[in-house]
Structures are given as C-alpha cells and as structure tokens.
C-alpha cells in the first residue's frame, strides 16, 4: 500500500524531507509507559536498478506530500489502466452496515484511504465485500493469518457467487499467471514479498486493497511487504485501530486519520435466578492465629547489622575469596 515517487526527478530538499519523515525512531515494547528500546525503522523501498530510482512510500503519506508540495510528483494507478469488476452483490446489508459503507465510500472518494473500525461481530468482512462491488475494481485482500484465507473465500462465494477468486498458495506461486484474470485475490501478507520476487507485475493489476486486521499488520516486516502493493484505493479493517508497542505511528502514514468508527451501544440484560443455594459462611471465615510474631523492639539489633564490614585481607577464607573476585579500580 504505497505510492511511487521517482527520486532522481526531485531536488535535494524533497529527498531530505523523505529521508527524515520516513526514518522513524520507534520505542519497541513501549506498552502505555516508557522504557522501551529505541529502533529506527525505514518505511520506504528504493529501487536503484532503475535510472529514475523509484521509491515506494506509504500510501497516505505520499498523497499528503503531493497535495502540500507542488514540486512533488507521485504515481498512483489510474482507473482506466485497471480492469473492471462488475459482479453483483446478492446479499442485503443491515442498516448500520449500510451507513458505515456509505461513510467509508465517501472517505475513499475524498481521501483515497480510510479505516473501517467496527466492533467484533459487526460484519466488517461483508461490508468490505459490498464496498468492493461498488468500487468495481479488482480487489486484493491481505490477511495476517492463514485461517482468514478460507473465511474470506467463503464470504465472497456467498455474497458474490459469480466472482472469480484466487487464493495464493505459497507453494504454487510459480504457477500463477502474470496477468491474473480474477475479481478477488486473497493472500497472506507474509507471502507478498515472495510473490513480488516471482512476478512484480502481479500485484499491479489490483486497484482496491483491503488490509484485514490492520492492527496486526502494522509491524516492520508486514509493513515492508505491503509496500510492494500500489493500489488506487486503500481500506483498513480492524476492531482496534491502535497499537501499544510503538508501531502506532504507521497507521497514519499508511491509512491516514480518516476513520469510520462504530461502537456497540447495545444494553445488556441481567437476569436474577433464585437457586436456593445457601453457602456455609463459617468455612470462609478467617481462622485465628495461635501464635504472634515478636515485635521489632524485642528482637534487638539484627545479626547482619552487628557484624563488621567485609574488608580485603581480613576475615575468613570465604571473605578473601569474595574480595579477590572484585574488579580492580
């Protein structure tokens, strides 16, 4: 999920800004409090084998940079360069799903990227599939776990039964066609780098990228793999759009601040059931102690305080051994 900027076509001022902004010092292991280890993460990929030295930079960061700086030119695929996915969605969304879908589509039209953050059980997968049918572009779905591959495949077959779906098997990457004629492609993010090494043009055929469980994919390794994909529209799906380990800075660089957030406001019902059970309270009462610890005054001076300090060359053989192991001044 990146935009492309050709570094040889820009001046040193722009390149210095890129180097500064995309070299992030992240406090690894910082969960709500300080004390983590600082680590520099480079959030870009530079191809020096090409004369123009193209560089893949985070999606939203690239769009924002080009918008605020007239001298910057970025590459993002045009709709006319991509195929059309015109398959029909046969299901029906709930009212809250329809509202969130419309809000997300509006944000994608205006900002090209957003996050769909809804509570667990909301139906984010179905909503995203419906959005893909509205955008009408070949869709790449990146998931962080293997079980999610089959889950997405089943949901697509259920709601868009006429769609052609390709699930990338890492053991069969070499047999994939260079120009996949499919409506949906589902891949484990860990296998993206292997796929791009085999055929860099494969991922360029998709105009809509859906990043499932986005909070799990905002890590150094997975973000590096996702930089290979250059979509026209980007959607992140997560119920928890944050991280406590320092990598939260990647959210804004890739997806931006725009978010559709739906919270669960359902009231809980509490039922009171009479069981007739009466516990024996005497079993849980604290038992009285049969002895009392002596007070501090009655103990006197502790033995370890009454001993003289250990000095080198005096005392027992154990003392001399301990003293001889000290590092010299």
From Swiss-Prot:
InterPro entries named among the record's database cross-references: ATP-dep_DNA_Helicase (IPR050615), Helicase/UvrB_N (IPR006935), Helicase_ATP-bd (IPR014001), P-loop_NTPase (IPR027417)
Superkingdom of source: Viruses
Gene Ontology molecular function: any one: helicase activity
Residues bound to ATP: 118-125
Pfam family, one: ResIII
Keyword NADP on entry: no
EC id: 3.6.4.-
The keyword DNA repair is annotated on this UniProt entry: no
UniProt enzyme class: hydrolase
Keyword terms, alphabetized: ATP-binding, Helicase, Hydrolase, Nucleotide-binding
Motif mapping: DEAH box: 212-215
Family to which this protein belongs: Belongs to the DEAD box helicase family. DEAH subfamily.
Protein name, per record: Putative helicase 109L
Organism expressing this protein natively: Invertebrate iridescent virus 3 (IIV-3)
């Amino acid at each position: 999920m990146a935009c492309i900027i050709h570094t040889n076509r820009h001046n040193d001022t722009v390149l210095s800004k890129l180097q500064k902004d995309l070299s992030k010092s992240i406090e690894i292991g910082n969960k709500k409090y300080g004390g983590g280890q600082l680590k520099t993460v480079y959030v870009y990929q530079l191809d020096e084998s090409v004369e123009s030295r193209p560089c893949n930079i985070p999606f939203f960061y690239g769009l924002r940079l080009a918008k605020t700086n007239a001298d910057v030119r970025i590459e993002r695929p045009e709709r006319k360069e991509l195929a059309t996915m015109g398959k029909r969605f046969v299901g029906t969304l709930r009212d809250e799903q329809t509202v969130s879908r419309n809000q997300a589509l509006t944000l994608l039209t205006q900002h090209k990227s957003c996050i769909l953050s809804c509570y667990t059980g909301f139906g984010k997968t179905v909503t995203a599939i419906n959005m893909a049918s509205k955008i009408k572009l070949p869709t790449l779905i990146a998931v962080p776990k293997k079980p999610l591959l089959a889950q997405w495949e089943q949901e697509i077959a259920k709601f868009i039964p006429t769609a052609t779906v390709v699930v990338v098997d890492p053991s069969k990457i070499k047999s994939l066609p260079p120009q996949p004629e499919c409506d949906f492609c589902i891949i484990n993010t860990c296998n993206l780098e292997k796929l791009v090494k085999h055929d860099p043009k494969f991922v360029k055929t998709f105009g809509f990228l859906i990043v499932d469980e986005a909070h799990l994919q905002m890590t150094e390794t997975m973000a590096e793999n996702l930089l290979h994909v250059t979509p026209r529209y980007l959607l992140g799906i997560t119920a928890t759009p944050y991280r406590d380990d320092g990598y939260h800075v990647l959210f804004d660089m890739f997806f931006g601040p725009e978010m559709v957030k739906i919270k669960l406001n359902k009231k809980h019902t509490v039922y009171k059931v009479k069981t007739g059970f009466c516990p024996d309270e005497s079993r849980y009462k604290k038992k009285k102690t049969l002895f009392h610890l002596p007070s501090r005054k009655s103990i006197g001076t502790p033995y370890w305080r009454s001993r003289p300090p250990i000095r080198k060359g005096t005392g027992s053989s154990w003392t001399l051994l301990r003293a001889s192991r000290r590092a010299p001044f």
